[in-house]
Structure formats: structure tokens, C-alpha cells
Amino acid sequence: MSSAVGASVLLLVAREAKQRNGGQFTDAHGEMLASLPPEDLRLVQAASELMARDLVVKVTAPSGRSFFRVESLNKYRRKEQDADVSVDSVTQPFDESMVSGNGANYYNCFSHYCTCAAFHDTVVTTHPLAMCKHMMARLLADATGRYQTMQVEDIHLAQMLCPPPTVEGDDRLFSPGR
């Protein structure tokens, strides 16, 4: 979103669609979204594509804590083919490949933060946008209920949010004695 006003419009539309309309967008919502600048509409379109391909996953633990994980389209484009999106990673048991929260496969998304580089570059550093396409996809998916679900144990949720160090010697940074 190119402005706080644009972000506010999208948040209002998503909240209304979720609470009042059972996840359905109305013509009035369309009119509100149509008032957004073209760059914001491109982000909405990119986020809608992520949601339409079922790349948004809500990860929930028994404690009730949850977050959204959005799969990257880049891994499919790098293969220079339009591959079918598989949700095997969502339905399979937890494994170590699911720990990484950023990079080529997944981005961990919250209402206020995303682990993608675009969030850091365009939202945090230069401020032309109020959110990235992954955060917008999370918002749209939550409003419409159109997302995959993944149940994990609390320890696995913690590992997904804060992966253990991968470089030898970095473990001292996370030792309980520090």
C-alpha cells in the first residue's frame, strides 16, 4: 500500500468482509478498492494471486498461538514453468524443512511484519508501501477464510518462528546462560 490511507481502506474492507459478510466482498467493497492508486491495486492483484493459488497457510499450535505462512511464487518461476501448486508440504507431518521462515519457499506473515526482503526494503527502509503482497495475501485470506491450515506442536511453532542457528558457533548466541 502506498499510503496509510490505502492501508486503512484495505483493512476496513477486509474487516467488514470477515465480520459482516461471511468472507464475501460486496460491490461497495469493490468501489472502495477501486479508489486506491494503481500501485496499490497491483499489490492487491498480486496478493489475490497468492490466495487463489492456495499459497496462504495458517499455522496453529495447541496453545492457540498462530501465524500465517505464505509460500513464494518465485520458486515456481525459477523453474521457468508454471508448475501446479502442491499443498503436500501442508499435509505432511512436521519436518526440518518447514523450520525456515524466509528464503525461497515461505515467508512468515503477521499483521505488522513479514519476513520477505520486499517488506524490509519497501516498508521498513524506504516507506513507499505500508505492507507487502504477502501481508496483503494474509489479510485477504483471513477475511475470506480461504487459506490452508497446518496444526503443529508448540515446540515446532517456536522453531518455525525462530529457527535454530545454522552456522557452527552461532549456538552461543542462543544459549540460556547469556
Regions found by a protein language model. Name each.
Residues 1-178:
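Long, low-complexity, compositionally biased intrinsically disordered regions
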